[in-house]
């Protein structure tokens, strides 16, 4: 009612999805347009993304691109990251395409010139994986370290993953522990994974479950999946043991 842009975007999503209230696509569209006319850059980015396929606004990629491009030209690093990851879909881009080259350039600009922490993390992951850009462990470490220096909790887990991919599980554990100590859910979830398989540490399912629970509490979805798999295995084992007991009784 008071025209707070982030709240308008949230309300537009509720209206567009029919969540918590009656669906109103036109009302959602009007709120998004109103948000784009404000000076609240974060809300404008969020509103622009709703015009991409899958958003609550009527699909209008041109409008989304135009809004984000305008913000990029003004030096908005969040818009650079949004354009690279959402418009260019950098995670799924093929190597050496215009999309991958432009996306990497935007992320590097956001990371180096504007110290954007998300850009640092994405670049570290992309250089570590080598699917979109040629694998470069040195650059992966460099961007992870930049994120650590910028006090990004997830960066410790990102650094751990780099060493895990190199096969240096003991060093990976060191980094996961550093992230876990500051309650980074991703690092805690990865610690649980390492303990569950005995990678770089002595296998300890009790510790694995403990770390997964902490990670789930701190928002790590993968840890929640690991916990569910662990519970399913326990149920299956219990059911098998009981079936064996029943067989022995009948003999």
Task: Label every model-predicted segment.
Residues 10-17, 47-53, 85-91, 122-129, ...:
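Hydrophobic face of amphipathic alpha-helices that form TPR/SEL1-like repeat modules
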Residues 1-5, 17-19, 37-44, 53-55, ...:
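Short helix-capping/linker turns of helical repeat alpha-solenoids
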